A protein has these predicted regions:
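Hydrophobic ligand-binding cavity/cleft-lining segments
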Residues: 1-51
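Intrinsic-disorder/low-complexity, polar/charged segments enriched in Ser/Thr/Lys/Arg/Asp/Glu/Gln
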Residues: 3-11, 17, 54, 68, ...
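Beta-strand elements of well-folded, non-transmembrane domains
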Residues: 12-14, 63, 90-92, 127-129
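Hydrophobic pocket/interface hotspot
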Residues: 18-23, 29, 55, 73, ...
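Hydrophobic-ligand binding "helix-grip"
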Residues: 31, 61-118, 156-157
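A conserved amphipathic terminal alpha-helix motif
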Residues: 99-104, 120-159
Length: 159
């Protein structure tokens, strides 16, 4: 069976509550992006508060240009676990490049485990839910190195 996930782990010198607060704030996601795609939310975004919450994020990739992702919170356990699944906003200009292709089914999840004031953070990128074979061919969309960079940036953002 093909493995459809990658992950990276880092210990951050901060309590889980502080790490979780940064991850739960979409306004800070540009500071965390190890792949260089996240440009920020439209205006001021509310903090994430539970499974099913939706937030949008402006993105950019060379070759695709500017686009917007609609993210749905898929995991939410305060100070322990948070994650979301992105899907392209069908109303953004770049969506026409994917007409007829289901560009959903992948998730980003962070698991936090605190010990002695420090937090072990594991970021997992998973695409087991991708149903469209055309879309699945281009996975993974990020690398383990991107996840490692993201964790390094998270450590800096937590301060």
């Amino acid at each position: 069976m093909e493995i459809k996930k990658i992950s990276a782990t880092k210990v951050i010198d901060a309590p889980a509550e502080a790490v979780f607060a940064v991850l739960a704030d979409p306004n800070q996601h540009t500071e965390l992006d190890g792949g260089g795609m996240v440009k920020g939310p439209e205006g001021e975004a509310a903090p994430l508060g539970g499974i099913g919450q939706v937030f949008s994020m402006n993105m950019h990739q060379d070759g695709l240009g500017d686009y917007r992702m609609i993210n749905t919170v898929t995991a939410f356990v305060p100070d322990s676990r948070i994650g979301w699944g992105p899907a392209m906003d069908p109303d953004c200009e770049a969506a026409k490049n994917f007409e007829g292709v289901d560009v959903s089914g992948h998730t980003y999840t962070w698991d936090l485990r605190e010990a002695e004031g420090r937090t072990e953070v594991t970021e997992t990128y998973e695409w087991t839910g991708v149903k469209d074979p055309q879309f699945e061919r281009i996975f993974p969309l990020v690398s383990e190195e991107d996840l490692e960079k993201s964790l390094d940036k998270l450590a800096k953002a937590v301060g």
